[in-house]
Amino acid sequence: YYHPVVRVAVIYQGMLYLVNRGKKSFVSPDTIDYPFYSYVLFRHSIESTVRETMGGLGEKEDVMPRFLIRYTFENEKVKHLVNLYVMCVHSEKVMDQIKQPNGKLWTSKQIEENLGSGVFSEYFEQEFAYLQNTVLLAENFCCAGC
């Protein structure tokens, strides 16, 4: 059985917003990852879990994350069916609501320099290449003059 999980990547000005997962995280504790992730609880839908994970932002249609990819993640501890969503933030006001004390914006170059070094979560390590070749590429192409 693969337990469903929701993860939400946040992109702002062509950069990924990442935070520390915390020392008590079951998978990849004390590593860098997206600010929003959650297990899908019994009898909850994936979409409702996305909204709940986003807190107050989950009520706003203009910042609702979009589904990107579903994949299986397995290690010695877990079997997860990961549902990766992405949220492209265009407003500083919204970004201020997302910001956490331990978070920062990362460029693709900064991320590439730290991949494989244990800085990022196992999930993120698997997802970054896909993000880079889809959403980040499109974001940078569309916002080249922004």
Annotate each predicted stretch with a short phrase.
Residues 5-6, 101:
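Short loop/turn microsegments at loop-to-beta-strand junctions
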Residues 18, 69, 105-107:
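Structural signal for conserved beta-strand scaffold positions within catalytic alpha/beta enzyme cores
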Residues 2-5, 11-52:
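Conserved Nudix-box catalytic region and its N-terminal flanking loop in Nudix hydrolases
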Residues 23-24, 45-47, 51, 55-93:
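Active-site segment of metal-dependent pyrophosphate-handling enzymes
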Residues 18-19, 35, 56-58, 62, ...:
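Short acidic/polar alpha-helix capping motifs at helix-coil junctions
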Residues 1-2, 104:
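Generic structural signal for well-ordered secondary structure
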Residues 28-32, 76-80, 84, 88-146:
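Nudix hydrolase/Nudix homology domain
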